[in-house]
Amino acid sequence: MVWKEAVSVLQKAQELKEPPLMFTVFLASFIGLAFFFYLISNHRTKAWRGIPPGTFGWPLIGETLEFLGCQRKGNPRDFFDSRTQKYGNVFTTSLVGHPTVVFCSPEGNRFLFSNENKLVVNSWPSSVGNLFRSSLITTVGDDAKRLRRILMTFLRPEALREFVGRVDSMTKRHLAEHWIGKDEVTALPLLKRYTFSLACDLFASINNKDDLGRLWLHFMVFVKGVMQIPIDLPGTRYNKAKHAANAIRQQLGSIINERKIGLEAGNASPEQDLLSFLLSNVDEQGESLTDNEIQDNILLLLYAGHDTSSSTLTVLLKFLAENPHCYEEVLREQLDIAGSKEAGQLLEWEDLQRMKYSWRVAQEALRLFPAAQGSFRKAIKEFIYDGFTIPKGWKMYWTVNSTHRKSEYFSNPETFDPSRFEGEGPPPYTFVPFGGGPRMCPGNEFARLEILVFLHNIVKNCKWNLVNPGEKVIVDPMPAPVNGLPIKLVPHDSVYI
């Protein structure tokens, strides 16, 4: 039985297309040590009395291969549904090298969100922590509060309103160069380029094509290594991501040094971007962020600010092509806004507040294909939840996949229906694409800005048809159509760029 399970694990690894060296390591490890670890795992499970039901899977990798495999097959809910049907809404597993309790209900979401720094703290697996180091995603307690206060000063609506025109101008330029006048485009790679360029400009004023190109090449390797099995061997995604992260930090370090000189000489403005803001401001104790902290947090925001938004925009284009009545309503709303502007006048913050239906469309896309699948916490003390013991030091995981497509919370959950966000909207803690509580994504307003400005500019210039109707969407690590969503562009009679 153990031999068969080892072979099954190897087959799952091959399905994930990891390098051959990784297969060899897995095979050697499981053939030589499978039975020994099987006994240890059984003993360990019995030692923790009262924990939620479930299984730890294999040592080191646990059930990570199946977890990732379901995502890459386009069925991330399968991992959770199969276990909730067997164990209930709270179950035990092992993900990315850690014993983990998974919470699969709105009540579980509320519990974790409301007990931050009381019973739990934000705690990604060590593999993620090693990539993002001293960033907001890895810090806890007072350090996290300090970082969040500093970053939110730049990312709050009052600050972002000053960048709406800048985003609008860049969006028009991007569409004119890469979309308008084309018969057919592949949306995902273009949207990745768009959101990455936008994030680089707003966060660090990186707009030189050579600098952008180098950073882009490293970044594409980096994003593939986030949320991977933490095996640091040559050829694995995780190992490649670590090297890419170091290269990105080196490039950011050079940019930081140049910016310091520019600020001292008066050639750069403290308000021009996030980098200048971080270099020019101090916390409550009068201390500035270190260069390493700045590098780590800009790396985090580049990741969160471009990969998540490009994913959402891509599936949004897919849904609008599949639902022409929704497209027409978005077009009507956006043309009303465009008609209220003077010729050449850029969008302003107040215009975004008028895009109510457009944002409901974006919310529905986020419900069906949320960019972030969930997040980890760690128990800072032993506690009881729903009659089960959660040991101190254990990881916990909440997931959008436990509520976003469940008929208990959303009628006809597989149907694209923006009207479900009218009025009071969904029940509390059922729609959580940005998380919740003190650890809610600090960039949610920036994401809203990116999405609405792009949507405004694309719909008023063209509509589009899917080249591959029914194209499958997989999650690796963000939702993405398997062919990148090729679309045929149909320009309007009047072009508004």
Swiss-Prot record:
Keyword terms, alphabetized: Heme, Iron, Membrane, Metal-binding, Monooxygenase, Oxidoreductase, Transmembrane, Transmembrane helix
Needed co-factor(s): heme
Cell compartments where the protein resides: Membrane
Gene Ontology biological-process entries: sterol metabolic process
CDD domains registered for this protein in UniProt: CYP90-like
Annotated TM spans: 20-40
Residues that, per the record, bind heme: 441
Main location group: membrane
The family this protein is said to belong to: Belongs to the cytochrome P450 family.
Stated name of the protein: Cytochrome P450 716B2
Known EC number: 1.14.-.-
Any GO molecular function: oxidoreductase activity, acting on paired donors, with incorporation or reduction of molecular oxygen
Protein's membrane topology: Single-pass membrane protein
Top enzyme class: oxidoreductase
Gene3D superfamilies: Cytochrome P450 (1.10.630.10)
One GO CC annotation: membrane
Top-level taxonomic group: Eukaryota
